UniProtKB/Swiss-Prot annotation:
Keyword Disulfide bond: yes
Family according to the record: Belongs to the scoloptoxin-04 family.
Leader sequence residues: 1-24
Keywords of this entry: Disulfide bond, Ion channel impairing toxin, Potassium channel impairing toxin, Secreted, Signal, Toxin, Voltage-gated potassium channel impairing toxin
Tissue: Expressed by the venom gland.
Protein name: Kappa-scoloptoxin(04)-Ssd1a
One of the record's GO molecular function terms: toxin activity
Propeptide feature ranges: 25-36
Length: 65
């Protein structure tokens, strides 16, 4: 009985993993850190709070103008 429960739990976790992968989600205990330089083009996209538009690279960068 105990072995059946353990195997059942393992199979459920395995199915959930494949479901997440099929949905395009990564399974990782580590969170991704936002890059210091955002790839948003400044002319067509407003920079988030705490970022400014770098005129040279046309990208949002962390800091103040």
């Amino acid at each position: 009985m105990k072995k059946t429960c353990v195997v059942s739990v393992f199979l459920v976790l395995l199915l959930l993993k494949f479901h997440d992968l099929s949905m395009g989600e990564e399974i990782s205990p580590l969170k991704k850190v936002a890059p210091r330089e955002q790839i948003f083009p400044c002319p067509g996209f407003p920079c988030p709070k705490g970022y400014f538009c770098d005129k040279g690279s046309q990208k949002c960068r962390e800091g103040t103008d």
